[in-house]
């Protein structure tokens, strides 16, 4: 649906060249809710602006719905843009226009009939839960209601793609949750592909099925949300995951436990998925290795509606200790594990 092929984007200011994007490659599949996460200045917003040609790539290719738009003119982009809706952090509503007229604006500009405009706007306001606000003005609405108006406006042209640039960053946690629920409903009801730009890992965790992690203009990690949460490969991905889920004990706790430890030991970090949570893993390990298993840390969370568990286990070691059977058990049970010591 959306594909970036070795995309780079540079800005030239005075005598300075700023590389906003460097060799970015990944694909957003049809019906995905695809998250792009990174800190401020990572290049996220520049990336999403390439999709609707608000910016043009310096190098590489941008493919949108099978069209290579990299070198498209504004005229060539007109039909493509009809299939792309966009919402922003600060809503971008017309304060002098009613809610109805704000939502209707794309149809008015497309010179649709009054009958079609009324029918379509009414449908969208009902979908976002604002039918009773149609005659009010943006200044009379809450932040969450303003974003719902923006979503209705983005959907009124029946797009295939919805771009969300920090759409929940200006909202409180409760309102954010309601907007994310609405966006998930947009995806499921209309089959719209959503590309989410955010710096909040909780947004990725709650709504996205796939994610790309950006740092300094580059994509440093991609995968399903479950893959990235279960085994983040890069430091920045690990840092983002730790903002919403504690996946291991604190350094101070490990240091204290190590100081109290008598004899050699080996630690394992394991990730247990929902289908395995009810399995007698600890009991199995005790029987396999013939010794006690210490649980130094355990944390349960929900990712995409699935319960997952992170554990840190410790085995005391002696000459008879053989980790081969333990490793084999984890592999047979399809439990992701990492030997820590």
From Swiss-Prot:
Residue span(s) of domain ABC transporter: 2-241
Catalytic activity of the protein: L-methionine(out) + ATP + H2O = L-methionine(in) + ADP + phosphate + H(+); D-methionine(out) + ATP + H2O = D-methionine(in) + ADP + phosphate + H(+)
InterPro entries, alphabetized: AAA+_ATPase (IPR003593), ABC_transporter-like_ATP-bd (IPR003439), ABC_transporter-like_CS (IPR017871), ACT-like_dom_sf (IPR045865), MetN_ABC (IPR041701), MetN_ABC_transporter-like (IPR050086), NIL_domain (IPR018449), P-loop_NTPase (IPR027417)
Residues annotated to bind ATP: 38-45
Keywords, ordered alphabetically: Amino-acid transport, ATP-binding, Cell membrane, Membrane, Nucleotide-binding, Translocase, Transport
Matching Pfam families: ABC_tran, NIL
Gene3D superfamilies, A to Z: 3.30.70.260, P-loop containing nucleotide triphosphate hydrolases
Organism: Staphylococcus aureus (strain bovine RF122 / ET3-1)
Gene: metN1
Cellular component terms (Gene Ontology): plasma membrane
Broad class of enzyme this protein falls into: translocase
Listed PROSITE patterns: ABC_TRANSPORTER_1, ABC_TRANSPORTER_2, METN
Family of the protein in this entry: Belongs to the ABC transporter superfamily. Methionine importer (TC 3.A.1.24) family.
One GO molecular-function entry: ATP hydrolysis activity
Disulfides per UniProt: none
PANTHER family in the cross-refs: AMINO ACID IMPORT ATP-BINDING PROTEIN, METHIONINE IMPORT ATP-BINDING PROTEIN METN
EC number: 7.4.2.11
Protein name as catalogued: Methionine import ATP-binding protein MetN 1
Membrane topology label: Peripheral membrane protein
Location(s) in or outside the cell: Cell membrane
Predominant cellular place of this UniProt entry's protein: membrane
Subunit-level organization: The complex is composed of two ATP-binding proteins (MetN), two transmembrane proteins (MetI) and a solute-binding protein (MetQ).
Main function: Part of the ABC transporter complex MetNIQ involved in methionine import. Responsible for energy coupling to the transport system.
């Amino acid at each position: 649906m959306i594909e970036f092929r070795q995309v780079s984007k540079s800005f030239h200011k005075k005598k300075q060249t700023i590389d906003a994007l460097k060799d970015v490659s990944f694909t957003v599949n049809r019906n995905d809710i695809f998250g792009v996460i990174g800190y401020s200045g990572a290049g996220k917003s520049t990336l999403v602006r390439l999709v609707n040609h608000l910016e043009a790539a310096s190098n590489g290719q941008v493919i949108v719905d099978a069209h290579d738009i990299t070198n498209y003119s504004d005229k060539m982009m007109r039909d493509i843009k009809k299939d792309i809706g966009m919402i922003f952090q600060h809503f971008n509503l017309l304060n002098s226009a009613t809610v109805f007229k704000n939502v209707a604006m794309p149809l008015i500009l497309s010179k649709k009939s009054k009958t079609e405009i009324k029918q379509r706007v009414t449908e969208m306001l009902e979908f976002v839960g604002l039918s009773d606000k149609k005659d009010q003005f943006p200044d009379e609405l809450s932040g969450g209601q303003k974003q719902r108006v923006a979503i209705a406006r983005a959907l009124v042209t029946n797009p295939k793609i919805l771009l969300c640039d920090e759409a929940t960053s200006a909202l409180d946690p409760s309102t954010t949750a309601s907007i994310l629920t609405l966006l998930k409903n947009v995806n499921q009801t209309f089959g719209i592909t959503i590309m989410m730009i955010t710096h909040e890992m909780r947004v990725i965790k709650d709504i996205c099925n796939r994610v790309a992690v950006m740092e300094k203009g580059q994509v440093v990690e991609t995968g399903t949300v479950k893959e990235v949460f279960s085994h983040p490969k890069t430091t920045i991905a690990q840092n983002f995951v730790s903002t919403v889920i504690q996946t291991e004990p604190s350094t101070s706790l490990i240091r204290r436990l190590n100081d109290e430890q008598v004899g050699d030991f080996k630690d394992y970090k394991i990730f247990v998925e929902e289908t395995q949570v009810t399995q007698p893993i600890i009991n199995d390990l005790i029987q396999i290795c013939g010794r006690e298993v210490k649980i130094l840390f355990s944390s349960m969370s929900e990712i995409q509606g699935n319960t997952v568990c992170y554990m840190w286990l410790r085995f005391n070691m002696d000459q008879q200790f053989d980790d081969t059977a333990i490793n084999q058990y984890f592999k047979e049970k399809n439990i992701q594990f990492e030997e820590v010591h």
